[in-house]
């Protein structure tokens, strides 16, 4: 037997979450500001995100790391270690789409800070 329940999945999500968290911790510089993308996080307007980026820049934060949970969500250890938790609404989004969404929001925030007309209120 596989030691799991009838469908062989007992403990799999938690194990996957632990492995994903370990890989993210290993890849994240200690000095980085860690932002977890999580449906239970705070929702930031684009200008609010720009203000946060400016504050972190002015405070000398050397790097930002955006963590995206896997298919089963983020582990509790990621939630505990995150400096901020950001939500793109309460919906669940595909991992690859979230990568594009956060990239666009970072770009948008930078254009807001530089006075570029890309963002319109």
Model-derived features: where do they sit?
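S-adenosyl-L-methionine/SAH cofactor-binding core of RNA-modifying enzymes
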Residues: 2-65
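Conserved nucleotide-binding/hydrolysis micro-motifs of P-loop NTPases
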Residues: 41, 72-74
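Rossmann-fold NAD(P)-binding glycine/threonine-rich loop
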Residues: 69
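Structured adenosyl-cofactor binding patch, chiefly the S-adenosyl-L-methionine
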Residues: 76-120
